[in-house]
């Protein structure tokens, strides 16, 4: 497996690069949550990748969030622990990217490793309009 940064250099698909940039932004912003003044505005680099008016994220339990709700959830998550992602593979077809990562979440000193699949759907301007999240983890 390789780092998200290394994968971004190697992939050739434009939409794959955007999906990997999404993961890279996540990795850069989460550590900022420990700094004073951290808030939802920290996600501006991620918002630049999003079709804000039509964005929809469907999570593990089929919960649906628009961009403002997701930004609030991201902020709460970032404040609750640490995140690290490692690249597994990416698949791109027109308008769609499937990104597989190994994610490590650390909360209270406990590290949980999760295999994730994120399905990114893009609008005609190459902005993320829909995101589905799937996970595998130890019981």
Ranges and model annotations:
Residues 1-14, 72-139:
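A beta-strand edge to alpha-helix "cap/lid" segment located at domain peripheries
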Residues 1-49:
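Short, low-complexity N-terminal intrinsically disordered segments enriched in polar/charged residues
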Residues 29-33, 57-58, 105:
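Alpha-helix C-capping/helix-to-loop hinge sites
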Residues 40-94:
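A solvent-exposed, acidic/Ser-Thr-rich amphipathic alpha-helical stretch
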């Amino acid at each position: 497996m390789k780092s998200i940064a290394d994968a971004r250099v190697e992939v050739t698909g434009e939409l794959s690069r955007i999906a990997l940039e999404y993961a890279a932004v996540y990795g850069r912003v989460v550590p900022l949550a420990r700094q004073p003044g951290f808030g939802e505005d920290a996600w501006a680099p991620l918002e630049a990748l999003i079709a804000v008016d039509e964005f929809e994220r469907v999570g593990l339990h089929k919960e649906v969030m628009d961009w403002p709700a997701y930004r609030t959830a991201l902020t709460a998550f970032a404040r609750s622990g640490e995140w690290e992602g490692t690249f597994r593979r990416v698949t791109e077809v027109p308008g769609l990217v499937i990104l597989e990562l190994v994610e490590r979440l650390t909360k209270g000193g406990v590290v949980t490793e999760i295999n994730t699949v994120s399905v990114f759907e893009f609008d005609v301007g190459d902005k993320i309009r829909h995101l589905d999240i799937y996970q595998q983890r130890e019981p």
